[in-house]
Amino acid sequence: RIHIEKIIGSGESGEVCYGRLQVPGQRDVPVAIKALKAGYTERQRQDFLREAAIMGQFDHPNIIRLEGVVTRGRLAMIVTEYMENGSLDAFLRTHDGQFTILQLVGMLKGVGAGMRYLSDLGYIHRDLAARNILVDGRLVCKVSDFGLSRALEDDPEAAYTTAGGKIPIRWTAPEAIAFRTFSSASDVWSFGVVMWEVLAYGERPYWNMTNQDVISSVEEGYRLPAPMGCPRALHQLMLDCWHKDRAQRPRFSHVVSVLEALVHSPESLRATATVSRCPAPAFARSCFDLRAGGNGNGDLTVGDWLDSIRMGRYRDHFAAGGYSSLGMVLHMNAQDVRALGITLMGHQKKILGSIQTMRSQLSCTQGPRRHL
């Protein structure tokens, strides 16, 4: 029997609930129950149950475990193990700046191990992102959400081509966007973006750029810069995952080996990555442009900037500190930020990283500078 206790989330296909699986003679097991919403079509039901069938084939500590499937009348539910800390992106945003680099690398190693397992079985995920990775009470990360997964042929160079459906642009390899050709190599690209999400504590990849600007910038050679305090070795691995030629990207077996080596040699994580080069044209157009103004009409405010990096909660701190223009903000250092009463290390890093990016943008942008 399954006893549903509360709703913990919802999506396009239905609700996700927390409950307990009651097995005679055994202790109740906490589970997550994904229920297909009422009024579903037969196609939706088939896709829903296909996801369960895929999950049922997997047995790995870094892949979400299927506990069972319920199909009774019009009822359709997928029952999986319950992950106390929810999705990785939300978990990291809640605990911004609270983990060591080694802990973050440990999380990534788990995700990489799960993806290596899937790749070895001939599966491509196609929707790998921090939102589709779940975290348990011991910080073990498990790959979930197999709604878009597909099996590849035995040929290691095989690719899966699809004619329709939505594509998560910010996490998807260029060839998969352009030609809808998915492979284990396109999953590796997505893993690189997950690495960036983890080191940036759940920040949105490419920030407020439009999907079209993301596509254009990546095509022009732009790659996400290292998050504040990111070790050079980790950013280099991200860049390897983002190689334009999919044949040049590392396989998941190599990715996991690199992460394991870093865990066993913590000194290799001490050197931090340098500030990125000038942004690509599409990135410069889409970013919070210091010359054009944050809201497009030339009125550039400290509040607009803080809102753009999701740090709007510190508007009053900056105002009380006398920082009335971005020109003043650009001269701030770590001590200045701490002096405002911003105590969370992750928030300090995010603010300082954004200031660093703005300085870089000003130095790269051509033409006369406007008064700040």
Swiss-Prot record:
Describe its PTM?
A: Phosphorylated. Phosphorylation is stimulated upon binding of its ligands including EFNA2, EFNA3 and EFNA5. Autophosphorylation on Tyr-206 modulates tyrosine kinase activity.
Binding partners and assembly? Heterotetramer upon binding of the ligand. The heterotetramer is composed of an ephrin dimer and a receptor dimer. Oligomerization is probably required to induce biological responses. May also form heterodimers with other ephrin receptors. Interacts with FYN; possible downstream effector of EPHA8 in regulation of cell adhesion. Interacts with PIK3CG; regulates integrin-mediated cell adhesion to substrate. Interacts with TIAM1; regulates clathrin-mediated endocytosis of EPHA8. Interacts with ANKS1A and ANKS1B; EPHA8 kinase activity-independent but stimulated by EPHA8 ubiquitination.
Its EC number(s): 2.7.10.1
Indicate which residues the UniProt annotation says bind ATP: 8-16, 34
| Annotated PROSITE patterns | PROTEIN_KINASE_ATP, PROTEIN_KINASE_DOM, PROTEIN_KINASE_TYR, SAM_DOMAIN
Q: Which GO terms describe its molecular function?
A: ATP binding; ephrin receptor activity; GPI-linked ephrin receptor activity; growth factor binding; transmembrane receptor protein tyrosine kinase activity
Q: Protein kinase domain: which residues?
A: 2-263
Q: What is this protein called?
A: Ephrin type-A receptor 8
* Span(s) of short sequence motif PDZ-binding: 370-372
The record's annotation in CDD domains points to: SAM_EPH-A8
**Task performed by this protein:** Receptor tyrosine kinase which binds promiscuously GPI-anchored ephrin-A family ligands residing on adjacent cells, leading to contact-dependent bidirectional signaling into neighboring cells. The signaling pathway downstream of the receptor is referred to as forward signaling while the signaling pathway downstream of the ephrin ligand is referred to as reverse signaling. The GPI-anchored ephrin-A EFNA2, EFNA3, and EFNA5 are able to activate EPHA8 through phosphorylation. With EFNA5 may regulate integrin-mediated cell adhesion and migration on fibronectin substrate but also neurite outgrowth.
Could you provide one GO biological process annotation from this protein's UniProt record? neuron remodeling
Q: Name one Pfam family in it.
A: SAM_1
Identify residues that carry Phosphotyrosine. Answer: 206
**Alphabetical keyword list:** ATP-binding, Cell adhesion, Cell membrane, Cell projection, Developmental protein, Endosome, Kinase, Membrane, Neurogenesis, Nucleotide-binding, Phosphoprotein, Receptor, Transferase, Tyrosine-protein kinase, Ubl conjugation
* Reactions catalysed: L-tyrosyl-[protein] + ATP = O-phospho-L-tyrosyl-[protein] + ADP + H(+)
Instruction: Give the GO cellular component terms, alphabetically.
Output: early endosome membrane; neuron projection; plasma membrane; receptor complex
Quote the SUPFAM superfamilies the UniProt record gives.
Protein kinase-like (PK-like) (SSF56112), SAM/Pointed domain (SSF47769)
**Tissue expression from the record:** Most abundant in brain.
Query: Which intervals hold domain SAM?
Result: 297-372
Q: Could you name the active-site residues? A: 127
Q: What is the lineage of its organism?
A: Eukaryota, Metazoa, Chordata, Craniata, Vertebrata
Q: Where in the cell is it found?
A: Cell membrane; Cell projection; Early endosome membrane
Primary gene name: Epha8
Q: What is the topology of this protein in the membrane according to its UniProt annotation?
A: Single-pass type I membrane protein
Where does this protein come from, organism-wise? Answer: Rattus norvegicus
> Which coarse location class applies to the principal site listed for this UniProt protein?
membrane
